[in-house]
Amino acid sequence: MEIIESKENKLIKFLKKLKQKKYRDAEGQFLAEGHKFLDYDTVPEIIIVREDIKDLYIEKLDRFECKKILVNEKIFQELSSQENSQGIIIVYSKKNNDLNSLSNNLVILDDIADPGNLGTIIRLCDATNFKDIILTKGTVDAYNEKVIRATMGSILNVNLFYLEKQEIIKLLKENNYSIIATYLDKEALPYNKIKLKEKNAVIFGNEGRGICDEFVNISDCKTIIPILSNTESLNVAVASAIILYKFREIEGLI
């Protein structure tokens, strides 16, 4: 394990840059923090270990043939985004996902703004085996440290695609997806009455504005979760959980 003792080290400077979106985009890499990520099979590029915990996770660290560096607490804090860190930071490469290999069931996220919501939805999609997630360019960066933390490792198990809205519409139409919009409307069906087709794409919208008109206008059906009081609406992550689990139930998978 390589020991780095200076925060002026080139690698440390590079790792600090990965805390910014523009560098994550340019390098195709991102940071994840916490030893739980080492339970996944995805091979890291680099593992950074705080020196005081180096003996706690030897078994996990030995699973991977990759660059490992040992740093003191001061340098580690320069890289960490957590107050009570477990002392492990991992550098992963983003997946090179193929739009030509999409599954028959897609989740579309339209301008989701809150990192916690996005991370929770990614974790949910992993749990319900909706592995392909298409995000509009207005959606928060999925490799943001808060999103990564909320995914609890599920970021490693899903395929993410950031596209312009018109690109998404073209993709769905050309590939004959049944487009289901979660949208409050007189014509909207309760979520448990939806008829699924061979290929389905369900769209969840921005926390404040909901789904954009472009998606509403091209949808094949609209669905709602009935509200039994005067509550205005449900949190988008909660709504996603209810609907995606119901769809898997309709398919007979749970």
Q: In which residue ranges do the predicted regions lie?
A:
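Boundary-proximal intrinsically disordered activation/regulatory segments immediately upstream
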Residues: 1-55, 139-140
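Glycine/small-residue-rich loop that forms an oxyanion/phosphate-binding "nest" at active or ligand-binding sites
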Residues: 68-92
